C-alpha cells in the first residue's frame, strides 16, 4: 500500500505539476527563510553562526508545522491523513515543471525564435547569466539543468521519503506521513541552499551551513541518479558504455560535489559535451568540460534528456521501494 501511495504522488506531479493557484509549501518555506535571515543577521555578530541558526530554525519550523498538521488530522478518518501526506509528497517532486520549462526552450529553438527570447526562457531555470549565450550554449545549459534537477528536484525528495519511512514502525508513525516529512525536510534544505548558498560577499559565510547541509543531503541521491541514468542508457537505446565511461571519468569535474555525477552520466548517454566556462553575476567561472563531443549538440538533446528523466525516475523509485520492502517486509 505504501508503494502505491508513493507512485500516486509521482503520477500526480506528472499530470498536475505545480499549479500557480496552489499554495505551494516550498513558497512558504522561502518566506520562512527570508524571515529568519532578517531576524538573525542584525542579532548575531558572526555571519556563519547567523546562518547556522537560520538553518536550524527553518528545519525546526518545518518539522513542527508538519507534526502539528498531522496531529490535527488524526481526528479525521485515516484516509484523510493518507491523502494529505500524498499531496504534500507530490509537491516535493518536479517532473512536470522541469519538463515544461526545459521543453519551452526546446520549442523556441526548433521554431526559430530569436535568441533573446530563448535566453529569457532559459533564465527561468538556470542561475548563470544567459544574455550572451549562443545556440549551442543554450542547449548545453538546458541539458545540464535537466540532469542536475533530476537529482535534486526529483530523485532526492523521493529518496528521503522512502528512507525515512523505514523508521515508521519504530516511531509509531504512518509510513506515508514520515515519508512526506522526510521529503519536505529535504526540500527545506534544498531551498535554503538555493536562496542562501551563494559564494558572494553577502552569503559566503552566512550561507555556508545551508550549502554544506545540501551537499550532504544530495550526496547519495546524486550518485543513485547517475547510476540510474547509466542503467537507463543500456536499457533504452542510449550509449550505455559511454555513459558509464564518462560517469567514472568526469563525475568530479564540477564545482559542485554532487551535480557532476548525473551530468557526467547524461553527457555520456547522449554522446555530447557539457559544462565549461560560464558567467554568473557578471563573473566568468572556469569549469572543466564534462563528456566527449562525439557529435554536435542539438535541440533534440533536450527532449532526449527529459525522456531519460522520466525513465530514470520510475526505475529508481521502484528500486527504492524494493529496497525498503527487503528491509521491512512492508
Swiss-Prot record:
Cellular component per GO?
plasma membrane
Task: Tell me which UniProt keywords the record has, alphabetically.
Answer: Cell membrane, Cobalamin biosynthesis, Membrane, Transmembrane, Transmembrane helix
* InterPro entries linked: Cobalamin_biosynth_CobD/CbiB
Q: Which GO terms describe its molecular function?
A: ABC-type vitamin B12 transporter activity; threonine-phosphate decarboxylase activity
State the protein's name.
Cobalamin biosynthesis protein CobD
The family this protein is said to belong to: Belongs to the CobD/CbiB family.
Q: Which GO annotations describe the biological process of this protein?
A: cobalamin biosynthetic process
Q: Which residues cross the membrane?
A: 60-80, 153-173, 227-247, 308-328
What domain of life does the UniProt record list for this protein's source?
Bacteria
The pathway where this protein functions is: Cofactor biosynthesis; adenosylcobalamin biosynthesis
Organism per entry: Desulfotalea psychrophila (strain LSv54 / DSM 12343)
Q: Kindly give the PANTHER family that the UniProt entry links to this protein.
A: COBALAMIN BIOSYNTHESIS PROTEIN CBIB
Amino acid at each position: 500500500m505504501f508503494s502505491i501511495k508513493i507512485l500516486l504522488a509521482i503520477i500526480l506531479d506528472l499530470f498536475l505539476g505545480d499549479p500557480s493557484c496552489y499554495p505551494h509549501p516550498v513558497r512558504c518555506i522561502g518566506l520562512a527563510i527570508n524571515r529568519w535571515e532578517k531576524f538573525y543577521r542584525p542579532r548575531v555578530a558572526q555571519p556563519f553562526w547567523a546562518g547556522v541558526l537560520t538553518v536550524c530554525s527553518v528545519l525546526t519550523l518545518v518539522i513542527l508545522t508538519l507534526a502539528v498538521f498531522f496531529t490535527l488530522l488524526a481526528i479525521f478518518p485515516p484516509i484523510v491523513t493518507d491523502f494529505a501526506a500524498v499531496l504534500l509528497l507530490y509537491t516535493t517532486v518536479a517532473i512536470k515543471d522541469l519538463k515544461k520549462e526545459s521543453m519551452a526552450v526546446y520549442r523556441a529553438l526548433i521554431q526559430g525564435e530569436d535568441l533573446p527570447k530563448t535566453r529569457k526562457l532559459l533564465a527561468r531555470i538556470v542561475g548563470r547569466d544567459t544574455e550572451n549565450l549562443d545556440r549551442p550554449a543554450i542547449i548545453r545549459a538546458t541539458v545540464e539543468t535537466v540532469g542536475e534537477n533530476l537529482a535534486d528536484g526529483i530523485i532526492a525528495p523521493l529518496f528521503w521519503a522512502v528512507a525515512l519511512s523505514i523508521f515508521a514502525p519504530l516511531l509509531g508513525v504512518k509510513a506515508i506521513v514520515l515519508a512526506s516529512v522526510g521529503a519536505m525536510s529535504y526540500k527545506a534544505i534544498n531551498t535554503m541552499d538555493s536562496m542562501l548558498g551563494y559564494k558572494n560577499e553577502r552569503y559566503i559565510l552566512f550561507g555556508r551551513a545551508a550549502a554544506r547541509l545540501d551537499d550532504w543531503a544530495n550526496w547519495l541521491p546524486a550518485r543513485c541518479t547517475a547510476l540510474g541514468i547509466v542503467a537507463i542508457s543500456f536499457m533504452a537505446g542510449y550509449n550505455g558504455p559511454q555513459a558509464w565511461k564518462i560517469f567514472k571519468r568526469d563525475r568530479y569535474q564540477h564545482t559542485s560535489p554532487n551535480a557532476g555525477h548525473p551530468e557526467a552520466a547524461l553527457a555520456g548517454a547522449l554522446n555530447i559535451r557539457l559544462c565549461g566556462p560560464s558567467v554568473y553575476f557578471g563573473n566568468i567561472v572556469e569549469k572543466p568540460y564534462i563528456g566527449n563531443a562525439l557529435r554536435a549538440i542539438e535541440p533534440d538533446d533536450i527532449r532526449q534528456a527529459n525522456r531519460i528523466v522520466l525513465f530514470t525516475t520510475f526505475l529508481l523509485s521502484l528500486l527504492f521501494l524494493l529496497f525498503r520492502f527487503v528491509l521491512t517486509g512492508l
